[in-house]
């Protein structure tokens, strides 16, 4: 999966407002419930970790993308490029923000939720968001091109049979004036509220709340935020 290529183009995608809005929602829950000792799964370039650090929360971030973790470490954030199954510490809250669960194939999702359960203390929270069907069909699909500095970026996203394939192409101008080309794809899957509810309950979580959230549009909720608690 093209997560490392996505890490290269992410700074040019102009998602700052959406990042701020969604992170504010997660941080509000952390602060209101006085949560501490938090693991951020799929932490990306560490934007949410920075919020936790500013608010003097104990935190740890993990991501499978080495490129993303390099950015975190350049910011002196506590983050590692390791798989969830390799985490040995226990936490009082786990977050997975900005479609992390949509990147996980259906057949692997139950294992991911079980692994999340294993890194949490009893009574700990698991908070995550997923794209709604409206979010995939009406928001995520489409094409964009970005021409900036010495780079040209093309992104083409198509949603079909409950899967969103995003093709990313990056052209970068070299010192000799020629352009290099990198291409890769990212696959995301739609997970229904009913499917996620079933897996969570089977994996020892109680669902406290499922919130509809309008991130990109005022028309319909393009995201669902799950607030869960470990009970087994």
In which residue ranges do the predicted regions lie?
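SAM-dependent methyltransferase
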Residues: 107, 130-194
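Core SAM-dependent methyltransferase catalytic element
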Residues: 203, 219-232
């Amino acid at each position: 999966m093209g997560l490392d290529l996505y890490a290269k183009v992410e700074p040019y995608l102009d998602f700052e407002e959406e990042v701020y809005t969604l992170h504010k929602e997660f941080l509000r829950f952390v602060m209101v419930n006085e949560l501490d000792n938090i693991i951020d799964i799929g932490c990306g370039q560490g934007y949410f970790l920075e919020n936790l650090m500013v608010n003097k929360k104990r935190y740890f971030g993990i991501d499978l993308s080495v490129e993303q973790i390099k950015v975190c470490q350049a910011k002196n954030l506590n983050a590692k490029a390791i798989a969830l199954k390799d985490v040995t510490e226990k936490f009082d809250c786990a977050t997975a923000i900005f479609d992390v669960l949509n990147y996980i194939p259906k057949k692997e999702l139950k294992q991911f939720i079980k692994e999340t359960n294993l890194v949490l203390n009893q009574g700990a929270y698991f908070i995550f968001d997923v794209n709604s069907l409206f979010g995939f069909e009406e928001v995520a699909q489409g094409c964009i091109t970005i021409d900036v500095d010495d780079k040209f970026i093309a992104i083409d996203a198509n949603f079909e049979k409950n899967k969103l394939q995003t093709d990313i192409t990056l052209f970068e101008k070299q010192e000799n004036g020629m352009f290099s080309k990198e291409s890769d794809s990212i696959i995301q899957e739609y997970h229904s509220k009913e499917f996620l509810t079933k897996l969570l309950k089977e994996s020892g979580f109680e669902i406290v709340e499922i919130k509809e959230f309008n991130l990109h549009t005022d028309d319909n909720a393009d995201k669902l935020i799950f607030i869960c608690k470990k009970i087994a």
